[in-house]
């Protein structure tokens, strides 16, 4: 199964994304900061400009921040919606949650798994009386929906696939009910980022699409095996409920078991890289 030729998710937004959209910024002169430096900038830099983000249905804002030395844009998402029932295009969802807190939890989990280079840094911050998640505005060229529409092929299919395998494992772990092709951004040298987790961490204890689990990075599998509930609880702070944490660990168990079974059947070299 080659992820280069398969849809990233069954849910694909109908809107056509233009390459000149405000979401896409040029990578030239992009500052090189550590994760901790990025967090501190997002937490402390002054907001000097704002405008509604050009995409999405969760009322996000594109903010311009400066600390006096560095000026950079950030994404601010304050949504925190809880409903007993929500009617969506895909059907009715009970105990519906759409919350910026899941962005923070997803980044914390990505850090634990060693794949935080594939997820933008998210911090919790208040702006204009609203608390939300603030993330580094990424230097992307296009999203995965645009790549599919334009039928663009990555120059290094193996490197691309290895990134996509990680994203697929992460998605099965976090149970994002709104994952779609616009949530995968593509930057310089076909670098991939996964963004927007506000509808993740559903309570199902089984991976939604186990067939997406085709191959796995060796280090990622070891990190998955080592993940423990106490550390996850501590890292995600107050962002996840006890039931959401239990569901993550249950899905982790299923994912690890599936890869172990695949290794037993096919051999390690066919499954891990």
Listing of model-derived features with the role each one plays in the protein:
Residues 24-273:
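Phosphate/dinucleotide-binding and metal-coordinating scaffold of catalytic cores
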Residues 1-12, 21-22:
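Bacterial N-terminal signal peptides that target proteins for export
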């Amino acid at each position: 199964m080659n992820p280069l030729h398969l849809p990233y998710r069954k849910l694909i937004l109908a809107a056509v994304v233009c390459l000149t959209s405000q979401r896409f910024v040029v990578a030239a002169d992009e500052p090189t900061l550590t994760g901790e430096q990025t967090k501190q900038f997002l937490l402390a830099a002054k907001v000097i400009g704002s405008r509604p983000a050009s995409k999405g249905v969760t009322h996000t804002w594109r903010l311009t921040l400066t600390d006096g030395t560095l000026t950079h844009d950030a994404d601010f998402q304050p949504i925190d919606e809880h409903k007993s029932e929500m009617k969506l295009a895909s059907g009715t969802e009970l105990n519906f949650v759409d919350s910026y807190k899941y962005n923070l939890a997803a980044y914390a989990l990505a850090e634990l798994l060693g794949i935080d280079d594939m997820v933008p840094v998210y911090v919790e911050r208040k702006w204009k009386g609203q608390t939300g998640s603030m993330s580094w505005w990424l230097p992307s060229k296009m999203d995965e929906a645009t790549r599919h529409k334009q039928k663009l092929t990555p120059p290094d299919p193996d490197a691309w696939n290895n990134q996509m395998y990680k994203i697929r494992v992460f998605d099965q772990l976090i149970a994002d009910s709104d994952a779609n092709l616009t949530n995968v951004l593509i930057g310089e040298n076909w670098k991939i980022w996964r963004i927007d987790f506000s509808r993740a961490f559903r309570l199902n204890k089984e991976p939604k699409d186990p067939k997406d689990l085709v191959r796995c990075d060796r280090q990622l599998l070891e990190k998955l095996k080592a993940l423990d509930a106490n550390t996850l609880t501590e890292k995600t702070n107050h962002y996840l409920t006890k039931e959401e944490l239990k569901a993550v660990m249950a899905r982790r168990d299923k994912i690890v078991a599936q890869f172990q079974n695949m290794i037993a059947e096919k051999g390690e070299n066919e499954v891990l890289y």
